[in-house]
Amino acid sequence: MQFLSVSRRRTDAFPPEAFTPELVGGEGARVKELYAAGIARQVWARADAGGAAILWEAASEAEARAALESLPLFKAGLLEIVVFIPLKPYAGFGPLK
């Protein structure tokens, strides 16, 4: 199954100093691990705010959420999940009925 998450950094609740190089670096490293494991399939940086959109692939929603919740910024409370939705194949590419 695939899932789409959109997150934003909680810059309204935390000062810039809260986003330490260690946390931000750890975030990038963890996303690379999840990508190498085939769980994070695609990652985009948001152009309108700090945060990301991530396409996840997992056997269940619980597995995808666990991967998302393993991110250092999420664990530190610095990341808000704005959208988390399950996806299904687009029917328009299938046979016409």
Regions found by a protein language model. Name each.
Residues 1-97:
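Conserved, structured core segments of small domains
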